[in-house]
Design a protein with these regions (language model features):
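N-terminal hydrophobic/helix-forming segments and targeting peptides
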Residues: 1-113
Length: 113
């Protein structure tokens, strides 16, 4: 069970979900919850809601679906990307880190800082 939780968390963390662009995370979670036989719904703000059946005390769990990341602001003629940070990403931790550039419509391009 411990290994399964680790695998599920790793898979979830690899789903791109920058602040304001959390749809892929919500879709991933919705699919996983529906596979467990649970119904889901979304509100007008994009929050994913699920109710677990039971008779015990009601508990609400909420968390962010978004991640720190970057937005591409310019693509230079040589293909170099100029990016702007979203959130508190520390610059000193970036060199050599793998990145995933989400082009749109599920088309992603792997790269390195």
């Amino acid at each position: 069970m411990k290994n399964r939780i680790k695998q599920d968390l790793q898979a979830l963390m690899l789903v791109p979900g920058l602040s304001g662009y959390e749809e892929r995370v919500a879709g991933y979670l919705k699919k996983q919850l529906q596979a467990l036989g649970l119904s889901t719904r979304s509100d007008r703000l994009g929050n994913l809601l699920v109710q677990f059946p039971g008779t015990g005390p009601k508990v609400m769990l909420f968390t962010h679906m978004d991640q720190l990341g970057f937005v591409v602001r310019k693509i230079e003629d040589d293909g170099f990307l100029r990016v702007e940070r979203l959130g508190g990403v520390p610059e000193r931790a970036l060199a050599g880190q793998p990145v995933l550039v989400c082009v749109g419509e599920g088309r992603d391009v792997a790269g390195v800082f």
